[in-house]
Amino acid sequence: MHHALDLGPVRGLSIDSGEGGYNLVGFHVWATDTRDWYENMLTMLMAGRAAEQLVLKRVSSGSGGTDDSDLARATRLAFDMERTLGFGSEHPLLYRPHRNPGAVFDREPELAARVHGRLEAALDRAAAILRRRRPTFHALAKALFDAQAMDQATVSQILTDSDLAP
C-alpha cells in the first residue's frame, strides 16, 4: 500500500509469528502535511484490515487492541485531522487538542461519526487499491510467507515486476 500511494520507499517486510508482521518504510518529505498526505496515511494504516477482509473474508483484532496499533494510530490521525490540523469539516480553523480522543468521542458523538467516516473512507480506499493491484498483493504475500522477511531489493523487485506486468 505504501508503494501504491507513493508515500516513499519500502525498505523491508517481515512476519513475526508471535507479534504479527511489520514493515520498514521511508517517507517522501516533499508531500507531507497536506490533506492528501494525511488521507494516504489513513489509507495505509487501514490496509492491513482491508487485506484481511479481502483474503480471509473476516477481520481479526490484529489491527487494533493497543495504543500503538494501526487502528489506534489511524483513529488518532483522523481525530487530529478534525481537531488540530485544520482539515476538519466543522470549525477547521480552531485548534482543539486533547490527550484522550476516546473521552472526547463519548461527549461528542458528531465528532466520533466524522472520525469514523474518515476511517471508513480510508478502509474502502485501501480495499479498492488492493483489489485493483491484486496480483502485486498476492506476489508480495506469497514471497513474504515463503521468506518470512524481505529486504528493500527483494520488495522493490516484486513491485517493479508487478508494475511492469500487463
Regions found by a protein language model. Name each.
Residues 2-166:
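Soluble catalytic regions of large protease machineries
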